[in-house]
Amino acid sequence: MNSPHLRVPQLVAIPAGPAGVDVLAAAISAAVADPALVIAPIPDVSPHVTEHLRISLISAIAPQRELTDPLVQVVLTTSGSTGNPKGVMHSLAAIAHSTRALHERLGGAGHWVCALPLHTSAGFMTVARAVLSGTTATPMSSLGGAEPFTSEAFIHAAEIALAHEGRHYISLVPQQASRLLQSARAGELLARFDAVLLGGQAIPADLIATLRDTGATPVLSYGSTE
């Protein structure tokens, strides 16, 4: 029989679409309030997430595994260079430190637009930064493969986020940024963000140049799951 004080990862099912941000934000807030809670976000099945992938992510998290490190409160999955998902453990203290360090680099805490899958490190951190900083995380309607990533979806989310006073940030993969630059209005809105974080893939030099030409402020980042 398991001990009543057994600490194991609690799976947090992230629905596709904007609702996923509220679910994840609530889970992060719960972990902040309860140091014994360990959260592990996984995506619900969607057009972009197969049941096979979901099962492999759950297997990597190993929700039946007892965690002996009292500082661990978040388990994220990464495929690394092998393509096989692995569960990587984090403390909220490390996530908070990363948040402070990034905001110091960027010029202060700000409001985030969420464009990346929320169970990934980059997507998770956009919500975590907002929760830990007391700002907002505005979801794109395409989150989690709920619908295709489009300039229109970005424009809608960006206009909501930019209505909040303060600084504004978004994290994208290069393919998304390239697609947004095909829309004049999307390009105009990107230029109003204080930083456009890029990572997750090789970043073409001409993409950086084009972003800067439009007035945007690209900041190169890398996967931070490990």
Kindly give the residue locations of the regions a language model identified:
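Conserved S/T- and glycine-rich ATP-binding loop of Class I adenylate-forming
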Residues: 78-81, 112, 127, 170, ...
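AMP-binding/adenylate-forming
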Residues: 92-97, 111-179, 219
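Glycine-rich helix-loop-beta junction characteristic of Rossmann-like nucleotide cofactor-binding loops
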Residues: 103-107, 159-163, 187-189
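Gly/Ser/Thr-rich phosphate-binding loop
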Residues: 182-226
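Conserved AMP-binding A3 loop
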Residues: 71-100, 107
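Conserved pre-ATP/AMP-binding loop-to-beta segment of ANL
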Residues: 16-21, 60-77, 108-111
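Structural motif
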Residues: 11-13, 39, 113, 169-171, ...
